[in-house]
Amino acid sequence: MTKFIEKPTAITPNRELQSDEYFNETDHLIYCSKCNTPRQCRHELQGKVLIPSIRCKCQQEIFEQEEAHRKLHEKQMEIEHLKTSGLQDKALYDYTFARDNGINPEIKLAHNYVSNWEEMKANASGLLIWGDVGTGKSFFAGCIANALLEKGVPVLMTNFSRILNTLTGMHFEDRNQFINRLNRYSLLIIDDLGIERNSDFALEQVFNVIDSRYRSKKPLIITTNLTLSELNNAADIAHKRIYDRILERCIPVRINNRNIRQDNATANLKQAKKILLNNHAPNQN
């Protein structure tokens, strides 16, 4: 009796091969011809064999690179949004550690505050930055603001004049909502305490802002031209209750007496004078 030997059925790929792929005859999966790792895997589910597509090694590397770029872009957009919201004066963008000229040794305390931010935040520890006019208090605070914003921390740096201008004319409920919005920021920095108008309304609103921040248990940084003695020995109850709240939560930091603003102005004038003296007037024909 004649026996017929059946020719084995050839196993073929379950989809069309791309130009950079080949079919592995051993495990019957499609492979990448560049990295020689599979682009398919085999799973058995309820008695059926499934062969889904997967990323080979080089595809996975490209995917991870693209994902890293996407996350970086999202982070940059988030930081830009935080800066737009938190830095209400464009000049504040330049108040960074990278632009520090080393004149104020106290700037190391700003570095330390940023480095220990999580602990400062947990303890609701703020700073009271005080000193004479033009000594770099706003720059000190701005460096902290920008450094934390770069880390993705929501920071608002503003001043009481701006706050009071916003609150003026608002109804009671609207004022409360505005003050509550200030507390959404992880760090609130208020520049130039003491230069705002000294009316009963202004003092009441300044207290409301400080007291609300105090009760929120979130850090507050204040800059002021007032001396520590003036803050500790307020002239009246209205000022005392404001200053007491600040001194309870904010570590005093004195910025030295050198007038950096005046030094910068003098340097700019010297540079302008040098330009004028070194450039000859054009010939008049």
How would you name each of these model-derived features?
Residues 1-101, 265-285:
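A short, basic N-terminal segment
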Residues 95, 151, 184-185, 216, ...:
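Structured helix-beta-strand junction loops
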Residues 192-193:
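Walker B catalytic acidic pair
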Residues 105-114, 124, 145-185, 197-204:
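Short glycine-rich substrate-engagement loop in P-loop NTPases that contacts/grips substrate
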Residues 189:
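SF2 helicase catalytic motif II
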Residues 87-91, 96-127:
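Pre-Walker A (pre-P-loop) alpha-helix and adjacent loop at the N terminus of AAA/AAA+ ATPase modules
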Residues 121-141:
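Walker A/P-loop nucleotide-binding motif
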